[in-house]
Curated annotation (Swiss-Prot):
Alphabetical GO biological process terms: dTMP biosynthetic process; dTTP biosynthetic process; methylation
Highest classification ranks of the organism: Viruses, Duplodnaviria, Heunggongvirae, Peploviricota, Herviviricetes
Alphabetized HAMAP family for the sequence: Thymidy_synth_bact (MF_00008)
Record pathway: Pyrimidine metabolism; dTTP biosynthesis
Record: residues binding dUMP: R74, R199, R200, R239, S240, G241, D242, N250, H280, I281, Y282
Annotated organism of origin: Human herpesvirus 8 type P (isolate GK18) (HHV-8)
The name this protein goes by in its record: Thymidylate synthase
Length: 337
């Protein structure tokens, strides 16, 4: 709903065109779209050239902008959304860190290591200089979730807790959960090593009994691993994908997780398959993503693991080196909270 008295269609069109939008007529729907129609932007591949895998992401953006359903959402900002999308990224010769904008690589590494520790304290991650969970751990946000009794930074039984202590009774972010619950991470490492053809090599963060205790229920909620020909591949199911900010981060995070698991189990990284449920673009991100769609992908970087480690707990941020990452400049987008 617009917070003003309805105007004639003619006047409304003039107002919105002045703000850089145009009206696109769809069957039964009058939708706003950017003045530069993203549907017209194409990234051509000529000859026998192998298409750049980042084009999958750009096509997803374009498809959502062109055909997305206009939906209300938890944040009140509003989104354009499509249901059910998939992309596949090879991990064999490169690492799928998007290049049409700079992705916060240090944040990807620090957040994943924080998950792997089982931590639920956003202040711990913030002390590393990665503040992506600060707003969700704020007093205001926790109170809005009915969690005003929690101290600032206590996110509840979110990703890391479910990965390392699934089923344990959550007390707070400061409690010691050693030996409590089911350690899914250790379980999948054991399966990959000892029963690699098992079809249950799954790690899941979606625990319905704990959802009301979480500052934010998991968006990327289930990953399954698959071993074939000495390679480890991963498929992620993500119920909710913020295409502007979250999805580029998630692609890198689960690709990194696959590299790490392959390293400790003596395998090679194979492929990352990313399956999205509600794939959406926040309306505040439309303009930045229009800019991103005008950019041509550059070669993906390579990822090197610099020392031999035998367990997931041994990894540190200094163990990873990104080689030849030359992205386009950063594109600023505000996080929807």
């Amino acid at each position: 709903m617009f917070p003003f008295v309805p105007l004639s269609l003619y006047v409304a069109k003039k107002l919105f065109r002045a703000r850089g939008f145009r009206f696109c007529q769809k069957p039964g729907v009058l939708a706003l779209a950017p003045e530069v129609d993203p549907c017209s932007i194409q990234h051509e591949v000529t000859g026998a050239e192998t298409p750049h895998e980042e084009l999958q992401y750009l096509r997803q953006l374009r498809e959502i902008l062109c055909r997305g359903s206009d939906r209300l959402d938890r944040t009140g900002i509003g989104t354009l959304s499509l249901f059910g999308m998939q992309a596949r990224y090879s991990l064999r010769d490169h690492f799928p860190l998007l290049t049409t904008k700079r992705v916060f690589w240090r944040g990807v590494v620090q957040e994943l290591l924080w998950f792997l520790k089982g931590s639920t304290d956003s202040r711990e991650l913030s002390r590393t200089g990665v503040k992506i969970w600060d707003k969700n751990g704020s007093r205001e946000f926790l109170a809005g979730r009915g969690l005003a009794h929690r101290r600032e930074g206590d996110l509840g039984p979110v990703y890391g807790f479910q990965w390392r202590h699934f089923g344990a009774a959550y007390v707070d972010a400061d409690a010691d959960y050693t030996g409590q619950g089911f350690d899914q991470l250790s379980y999948i490492v054991d399966l990959i090593k000892n029963n690699p053809h098992d079809r249950r090599i799954i790690m899941c963060a979606w625990n319905p009994a704990d959802l009301s205790l979480m500052a934010l229920p998991p968006c990327h909620l289930l990953c399954q691993f698959y071993v074939a020909d000495g390679e480890l591949s991963c498929q992620l199911y993500q119920r909710s994908g913020d295409m502007g900010l979250g999805v580029p981060f998630n692609i890198a995070s689960y690709s990194l997780l696959t590299y790490m698991l392959a390293h400790v189990t003596g395998l090679r990284p194979g492929e990352f398959i990313h399956t999205l449920g509600d794939a959406h673009i926040y309306k505040t991100h439309i303009e930045p993503l229009r800019l991103q769609l005008t950019r041509t992908p550059r070669p993906f970087p390579r990822l090197e693991i610099l020392r031999s480690v035998s367990s997931m707990e041994e990894f540190t941020p200094d163990d990873f080196r990104l080689v030849d990452y030359c992205p386009h400049p950063t594109i600023r987008m505000e996080m929807a909270v």
